[in-house]
């Protein structure tokens, strides 16, 4: 039967997930522990019964547990008074005990203590025992008492609450038996059970409290008398009433008693026991207890409860403390007890029993300030600040608290003694029930609904009989049903109660079925709850019962007046119930335990809530209301349902975090790869260059988006089902409390001088290590936060989508309040969700259109896009930034774990102010060379071929050769010096290599020489871009074809994950990439083509993942498996339903393939750091762009390897977003190579010969940026072919630069700049170059560089499909093209355009010619630009755009004369062949120029059809501003 709402709230077992405090450890219990003895006799020589650790209270009551010191009075009655009427006999006993209860009780206490001394019990300090069940489980391990040993009772000295004492069950049992014998109600309640037990709630409750629970509480007071009030701290007082105090019911095993708030005094409350069984006639001290400012309320531990309780509130008292030091005896007559007298006890720990839901009332004030309530004969009290507020002639509406009703005795009484019980109770003063309290009110208005609450409480009760029919319908319609074994018993994995991790498919079906009944509840009928000005922490939490119908939802979006929730489990809605996909929380939503206030402003993004009731949102109130619709039509913007009742499950424990602010107000958190939101009123109050410590909420990230209980073999099929439903990323964490961290900020100031003994002489080694870790970890987290690129966890609806090949163009909103501009950038990884599931992609261009308030985005889709995925048809598509999975590389303590002598630690110490590392020079005459090489590389011999005769390598370095055909190429002396330094075993060397100096060839040569020394040691070659790594692969492939016998077994691979590989453009993929080689290798392994004797290192989990990968990618039919693989498949096939684990697959691949050289980008290197072992050398290309955090990760993982950094400090430093600045940027991104060269930290060699550019270009750049140190390695003739062949285009063929003056104005686009006239000029030039009938240029040989990201996006769209690469200056570092078109865009030359390193990169990309488009007057006045412009003008290559246009049109090579790009693949190939045959020497590089980027033919790029772009936006949808 479906439980009603009231039953749910009454039966629910709340739990406390609040952060622990020191109050929770206060269990001040005295402990009597018996000395060890071999005897098992008690003090009377009788055997002591063994105590079962699992014995229950019922067993204790029947005598199984505990020892009795006196015979039960019933024994004598049964022998001496057997003929007496039972009622008369009991009456006689009760009267005699009642008359002498006080003296008898005190005598019993004295007798008891004497007996305890005889038993030899002692009080000792022991670990805390916090519950009844805890000391029960301990009791079986206690030694038996010895009748021969005696000792005094030593009272434990309680010095502080933090030193609790433990409970000895034997002493407790003795006290309990004494209380049982003295309590007048014992005979009246013994041996009976509570009626209708099955209908009672779980946990301690007023209606299931029993007589033996009262005995436990009274007995426990003898232990609690050691607690002293002066040892408890006073708690701070909150000024305003907190209505929604956390409430719950204590567990069954907890010793407690129920008390009611009877009186309110100035600084305390007086409580009266709810059940007279607790005190009887003999324990008047337990009749009244007080609550004061030392009382701890569960869930409200940090504040005093004074001022927050109502008269009539029920409190569960779980611990007592003596109020007065003079109290020496716990016993007193109940006749002496009075609420006006000082209480002997205070309630030191209490739990608020769940209150009734607030009641809406209509009333008028009486003359004495009370309330006369409509339709009620009983007055109510009103909380008034001033009696003058009460206007007797005005009607008011308000919210009232009504106290609970209960019987004054427990329910386990003997039925025949009921009248006797009532007679005895009449001798005890019983206080009447407290009046209800109106705590919030306002003047009456006709719109206020007073009696609606009762009417709307259960409007669906009559429809519950149809629930089974709805449930059956949902079960049959839900697409997930077939994957779950519904008939099988679905026992929850993690105990009673529902949670997000143990929810079952049947629970989802019940919730969906119940929605047909909840449709009768409407939002307009629910009252709006008042909103609190500040967030309440902690909120009350609880777990829904097993019998409660609910579903779990996650907070996805936060608005000012509502939250949007998304279902955690897709079983709830399947494909057919799109109305249940998103729900709304608004001001009418009730949170369990927080019913009196609105929950708006109290939840975090990412919070998980259990929805226990729905209501139809306003706007969906039609009687013709139809619930189901396809999930693809669901939208977070228009919710069908609101969550009218919710429960907050236990939140994750608050996390302590160290963080710094970024410019965008988000936080970089130490140890995290993603930013966090910060609750801060004003960003002006914080500084970005400081470290703060705070408390954060980290949302729970469920592993599955469907429920438990699925059929394991069908898990992969369920995953396929869920992929067809759009997913949303998890939310960022939220920091809600913080302050400056003084110690960490001191470390921050010392920073890179941590190991400087000159600047800081008194710092200990331990503190130096902490400084390094603090700075490096904060920087590491900052850099990862920036590089991961997810700064927006929102999902946006895609407007007017257009797909062309693997590129999709769409628009998303750019709201003014929370703009997307700046958070959505080129390079962001995205996920697009729609009716057919999800597909991944990467943003290529972002263009702001302020007129309509949208961003225009073009993204490249992943190649693993499902075949059926389409943007056509019904349904909406949403896009969000893809979530990044954290991959911790640096963690707390990483630096301390490094061996003091390893290369990694030595390098880090040098980077942080330690002594420079001197160059290691190997003397070839030294007989120890073999030993050194053996230590460094595991080499026994082989260095002799590099020996020189009698001189050190730094004077005459060995000549090295690069393998090539037909003859090896000799490296120049600077390149040889670099190779020799790496071979000499230096921990770290730096190769300062200007543009075009052949550094790629130098890196490969050094790697090959190391390979010859020892072939079973891996080497890592790291680049900064995929294009550069492809270049290294290209060079390595040519090396293998050189015919060198020493290299015939060389194996290399480019490491790239399968997911990233699917998103790479075609010209960035090779057949040496790991995904390609992995599929080939695993296929050979599966078919038995690989010798298995060499694969003993593989473990079972490797085999399982390999077979899963083969099946998932359909590489081999299982029928064709080799014998050994077939056995594995047959034995382990049950595990193959799971998706393959990527890291395990990579491990298996490297174990089988065993590559010698591994090429990888710096970003992808993280995936290798925990996999590769035995790496002897790491070389890093374009090292000037290497972020310091990446280098630190490499140094930590490969701490025994030698490192070679080769790059140019006169080019761009490591890339960093504008959001990162100050110390976060210095420690995370840094400029390691420049700092190392300037401060002479490591050995350096400088390459000087330039083989890329035209000699005059090299000469000009050498004078501008290198102090004239560069030497050209090529002739002018080799770089002048284009100029000489296109004299119609190029004014002066003897100078390789041309300037086109553009007078068109630029336009601001967000924080960037664009220029439409410049775009047109670029289009004209590109058309001219690639459409020339005599000398057409291959589009892949043209590069367009812009200094502004907005202009880059516009140019990319303008030239899309042409095969011409467009990019920023940063994107072009490491690349080269025959022809470069450089766009300055802005007529106002900004500071960053005048940076020497940026201009150096832009001007050094061209092998033949550079065409500059810019504003002449502006550039004449700019640094460096003025020199370049003057040189061009002196050589006659300065033209005006309009004049140049006219000249080209006279020569008939304009846009109107020739088609843009031929749509015929054959004619295009013919023109390319003709061009290549006529310009062979232009394509061929000089003999020593193997470091260039390989050309990519235009046939690899998608066909361009139609016009260029209709002024860029022609293919874009026209979005109206009203959208």
Curated annotation (Swiss-Prot):
Its EC number is 3.6.4.-. Residues 1463-1476, 1485-1498 have a biased composition (Polar residues). CDD domains: SF1_C_Upf1 (cd18808). Keywords: ATP-binding, Helicase, Hydrolase, Nucleotide-binding. InterPro entries: Coronavir_polyprotein_1ab (IPR050534), DNA2/NAM7-like_C (IPR041679), DNA2/NAM7_AAA_11 (IPR041677), P-loop_NTPase (IPR027417), SF1_C_Upf1 (IPR047187). It holds the Pfam family AAA_12. Residues 1-89, 1463-1498 are annotated as: Disordered. It comes from the Eukaryota. Belongs to the DNA2/NAM7 helicase family. This is Uncharacterized ATP-dependent helicase C05C10.2. It comes from Caenorhabditis elegans.
């Amino acid at each position: 039967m479906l439980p009603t709402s009231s039953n749910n709230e009454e039966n629910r077992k709340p739990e406390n997930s609040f952060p622990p405090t020191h109050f929770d450890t206060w269990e001040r219990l005295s402990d009597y522990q018996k000395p060890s003895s071999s005897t098992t006799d008690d003090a009377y020589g009788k055997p002591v019964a063994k105590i079962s650790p699992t014995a229950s209270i019922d067993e204790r009551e029947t005598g199984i547990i505990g020892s009795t010191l006196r015979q039960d009075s019933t024994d004598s009655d049964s022998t001496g008074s057997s003929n007496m009427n039972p009622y008369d006999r009991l009456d006689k006993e009760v009267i005699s005990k009642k008359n002498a209860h006080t003296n008898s009780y005190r005598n019993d206490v004295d007798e008891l203590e004497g007996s305890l001394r005889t038993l030899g019990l002692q009080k000792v300090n022991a670990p805390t025992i916090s519950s009844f069940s805890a000391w029960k489980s301990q009791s079986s391990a206690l030694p038996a008492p010895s009748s021969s040993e005696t000792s005094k009772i030593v009272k434990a000295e309680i010095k502080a609450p933090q030193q609790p004492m433990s409970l000895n069950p034997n002493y407790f049992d003795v006290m309990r038996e004494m209380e049982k014998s003295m309590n007048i109600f014992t005979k009246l309640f013994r041996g009976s059970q509570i009626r209708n037990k099955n209908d009672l709630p779980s946990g301690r409750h007023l209606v299931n409290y029993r007589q033996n629970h009262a005995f436990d509480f009274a007995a426990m007071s003898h232990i609690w008398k050691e607690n002293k009030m002066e040892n408890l701290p006073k708690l701070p007082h909150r000024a305003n009433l907190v209505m929604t105090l956390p409430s719950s019911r204590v567990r069954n095993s907890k010793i407690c008693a129920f008390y009611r708030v009877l009186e309110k005094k100035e600084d305390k409350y007086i409580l009266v026991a709810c059940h007279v069984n607790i005190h009887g006639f003999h324990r008047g001290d337990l009749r009244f207890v007080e609550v004061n400012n030392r009382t701890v309320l569960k869930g409200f531990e940090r504040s005093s409860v004074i001022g927050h309780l109502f008269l009539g509130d029920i409190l569960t008292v779980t611990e007592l403390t003596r109020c007065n030091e003079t109290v020496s005896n716990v016993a007193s007559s109940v006749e002496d007890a009075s609420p006006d007298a000082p209480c002997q006890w205070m309630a030191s720990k209490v739990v608020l029993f769940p209150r009734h839901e607030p009641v809406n009332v209509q009333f008028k004030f009486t003359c004495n300030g009370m309330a006369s309530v409509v339709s009620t004969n009983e007055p109510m009290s009103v909380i008034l600040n001033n009696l003058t507020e009460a206007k007797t002639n005005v009607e008011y509406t308000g919210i009232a608290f009504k106290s609970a009703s209960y019987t004054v005795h427990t329910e386990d009484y003997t039925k025949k003694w009921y009248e006797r019980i009532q007679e005895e109770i009449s001798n005890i003063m019983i206080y009447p029930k407290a009046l209800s309290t109106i705590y919030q009110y306002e003047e009456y208005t006709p719109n206020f609904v007073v009696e609606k609450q009762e009417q709307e409480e259960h409007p669906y009760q009559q429809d519950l009989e149809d629930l089974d029919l709805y449930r059956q319908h949902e079960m049959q319609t839900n697409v997930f049903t077939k994957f779950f074994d519904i008939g099988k018993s679905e026992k929850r994995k993690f105990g009673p109660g529902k949670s997000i991790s143990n929810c079952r498919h049947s629970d989802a079906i019940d919730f969906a079925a119940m929605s047909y009944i909840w449709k009768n509840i409407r939002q307009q009928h629910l009252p709006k709850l008042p909103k609190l000005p500040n967030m309440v922490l902690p909120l009350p939490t609880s777990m829904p019962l097993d019998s409660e119908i609910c579903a779990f939802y996650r907070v996805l979006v936060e608005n000012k007046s509502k939250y949007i929730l998304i279902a955690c489990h897709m079983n709830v809605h399947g494909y057919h119930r799109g109305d249940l996909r998103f729900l709304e929380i608004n001001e009418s939503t009730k949170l369990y335990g927080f019913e009196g206030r609105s929950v708006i402003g109290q939840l975090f993004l990412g919070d998980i809530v259990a929805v226990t009731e729905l209501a139809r949102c306003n706007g969906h109130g039609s009687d013709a209301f139809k619930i189901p619709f396809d999930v693809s039509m669901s939208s977070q913007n228009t919710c069908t349902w609101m969550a009218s009742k919710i429960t907050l499950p236990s939140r994750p424990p608050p996390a302590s975090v160290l963080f710094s602010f970024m410019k965008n107000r988000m936080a970089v958190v130490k140890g995290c790869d993603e930013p966090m939101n910060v609750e801060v009123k004003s960003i002006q109050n914080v500084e970005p260059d400081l470290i703060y410590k705070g408390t954060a909420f980290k949302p729970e990230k469920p592993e599955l988006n469907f429920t438990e209980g699925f059929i394991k073999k069908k898990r992969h099929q369920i995953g396929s089902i869920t992929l067809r439903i759009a997913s949303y990323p998890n939310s960022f964490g939220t920091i809600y409390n913080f302050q400056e961290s003084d110690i960490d900020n001191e470390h921050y100031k010392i920073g890179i001088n941590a190991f400087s003994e000159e600047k800081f002489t008194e710092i200990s080694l331990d503190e130096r290590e902490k400084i390094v870790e603090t700075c490096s970890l904060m920087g590491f987290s900052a850099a990862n936060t920036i590089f991961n690129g997810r700064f927006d966890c929102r999902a946006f609806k895609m407007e007017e989508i257009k797909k062309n090949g693997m590129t999709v163009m769409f628009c998303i909103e750019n709201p003014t309040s929370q703009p997307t501009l700046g958070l959505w950038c080129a390079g962001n990884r995205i996920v697009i969700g729609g009716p057919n599931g999800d597909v991944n992609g990467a943003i290529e261009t972002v263009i702001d259109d302020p007129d309509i308030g949208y961003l225009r985005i073009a993204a490249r889709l992943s190649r693993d896009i499902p075949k059926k995925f389409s943007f056509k048809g019904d349904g909406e598509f949403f896009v969000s930034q893809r979530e990044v999975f954290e991959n911790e590389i640096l963690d707390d303590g990483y630096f301390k774990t490094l061996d003091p002598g390893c290369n990694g630690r030595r390098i880090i110490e040098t980077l942080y102010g330690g002594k420079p590392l001197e160059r290691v020079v190997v003397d070839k005459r030294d007989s120890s060379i073999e030993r050194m090489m053996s230590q460094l590389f595991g080499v026994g011999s082989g260095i002799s071929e590099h020996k020189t005769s009698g001189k050190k390598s730094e004077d005459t370095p060995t000549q090295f050769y690069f393998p090539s055909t037909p003859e090896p190429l000799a490296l120049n002396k600077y390149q040889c010096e670099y190779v020799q330094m790496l071979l000499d075993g230096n921990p770290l060397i730096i190769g300062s290599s200007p543009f075009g100096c052949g550094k790629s060839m130098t890196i490969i040569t050094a790697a090959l020489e190391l390979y010859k020394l020892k072939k079973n040691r891996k080497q890592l070659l790291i680049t900064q871009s995929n294009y550069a790594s492809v270049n290294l692969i290209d060079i390595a492939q040519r090396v293998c074809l050189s015919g060198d016998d020493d290299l015939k077994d060389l194996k290399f691979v480019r490491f790239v994950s399968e997911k990233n590989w699917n998103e790479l453009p075609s010209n960035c993929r090779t057949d040496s990439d790991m995904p390609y080689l992995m599929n080939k290798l695993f296929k050979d392994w599966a078919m038995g083509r690989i010798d298995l004797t060499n694969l003993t290192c593989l473990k079972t989990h490797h085999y399982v993942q390999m077979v899963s990968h083969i099946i998932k990618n359909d590489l081999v039919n299982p029928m064709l498996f080799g014998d050994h693989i077939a056995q594995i498949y047959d034995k382990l096939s049950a595990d193959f339903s799971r998706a393959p684990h990527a890291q395990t697959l990579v491990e298996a691949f490297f174990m089988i393939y065993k590559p010698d050289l591994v090429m990888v980008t710096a970003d992808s290197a993280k995936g290798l750091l925990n996999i590769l072992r035995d790496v002897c050398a790491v070389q890093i290309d374009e090292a000037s762009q290497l972020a310091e955090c990446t280098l630190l990760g490499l140094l930590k993982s490969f701490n025994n390897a030698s490192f070679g950094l080769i790059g140019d400090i006169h080019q761009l430093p490591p890339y960093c977003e504008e959001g990162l600045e100050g110390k976060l940027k210095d420690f995370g991104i840094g400029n390691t190579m420049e700092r190392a060269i300037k401060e002479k930290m490591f050995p350096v060699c400088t390459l000087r010969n330039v083989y890329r550019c035209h000699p005059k270009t090299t000469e000009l750049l050498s004078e501008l940026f290198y102090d004239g140190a560069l030497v050209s390695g090529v002739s002018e003739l080799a770089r002048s072919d284009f100029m000489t062949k296109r004299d119609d285009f190029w004014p002066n063929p003897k100078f390789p630069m041309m300037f086109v003056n553009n007078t068109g104005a630029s336009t601001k686009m967000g924080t960037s700049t664009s220029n439409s006239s410049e775009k047109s000029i670029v289009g004209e030039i590109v058309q001219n170059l690639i459409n020339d009938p005599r000398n057409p240029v291959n589009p892949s040989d043209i590069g367009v560089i812009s200094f502004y990201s907005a202009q880059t996006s516009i140019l990319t769209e303008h030239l899309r499909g042409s095969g011409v690469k467009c990019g920023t200056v940063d994107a072009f570092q490491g690349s080269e093209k025959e022809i470069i078109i450089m766009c300055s865009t802005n007529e106002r030359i900004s500071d960053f355009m005048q940076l020497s390193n940026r201009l150096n990169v832009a001007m050094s990309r061209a092998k033949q010619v550079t065409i500059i488009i810019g504003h002449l007057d502006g550039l004449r006045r700019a640094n460096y630009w003025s020199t370049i412009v003057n040189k061009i003008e002196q050589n006659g290559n300065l033209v005006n755009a309009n004049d140049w246009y006219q000249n080209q049109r006279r020569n008939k090579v304009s846009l109107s004369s020739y088609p843009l790009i031929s749509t015929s693949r054959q004619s295009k190939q013919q023109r390319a062949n003709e061009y290549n045959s006529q310009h062979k020497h232009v394509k061929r590089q000089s003999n020593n120029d193997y470091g260039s980027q390989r050309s990519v033919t235009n046939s690899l790029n998608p066909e361009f059809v139609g016009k260029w772009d209709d002024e860029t936006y022609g293919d874009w949808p026209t979005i109206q501003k009203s959208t």
